[in-house]
Amino acid sequence: LAPFFAKRLDDIKSFYYSEESFDDFYYGKGSTFGDIHGSVGILFEQASSRARETDSNQGKLTYAFSVRNQYMATLGAVDGLVALRNDFLRYQRNFYAKSADVASKNKVKGYLINLKENRTRAQMLVKTLQRHRIEAYDLKKSITVKGKRFAKGEAIIIPTNQPQTRFIAGIMEKVTTFEDSLFYDVSAWTLP
């Protein structure tokens, strides 16, 4: 999509930078949320005018200028989506078609969650899962796992082998190591 954004910003002679600089680690961030759902997440950043007008090291920065840049970038996105429609649809179809393969390679086959310990948070989690079409099942019989008892009717199991397997991993896993040392500091952010 970058060429489409670039063309629209070139048309208004606006300066821009069109490269990928940072990986997306936190799935609660807008541009990353699409990535985990088979979409293409895009982050636009620009200097804020903080008001109608402010001084910057490159001169006056106005609110109207900021809005114009965002508007033109949005038109660039529309241009690109129209031109690349079939590519985006194919990408998303393949993303979900590979879900079973991705799930089979995951060592974790499901998440067992006790609803009794913090019922309100657990209910909020279940609602979030339902909004994302993630299946969670009531525990049919009481079990003990690693010395912890999970009672029938007071726990759920979330299998990872379902179309939203990547999202399940994204919200349940706690990532504490990163391959790249250069990133926005979101290392303490997590959805669980």
Question: Model features per residue range: what roles?
Answer:
Residues 1-16, 20-26, 30-192:
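Intrinsic-disorder/low-complexity accessory segments
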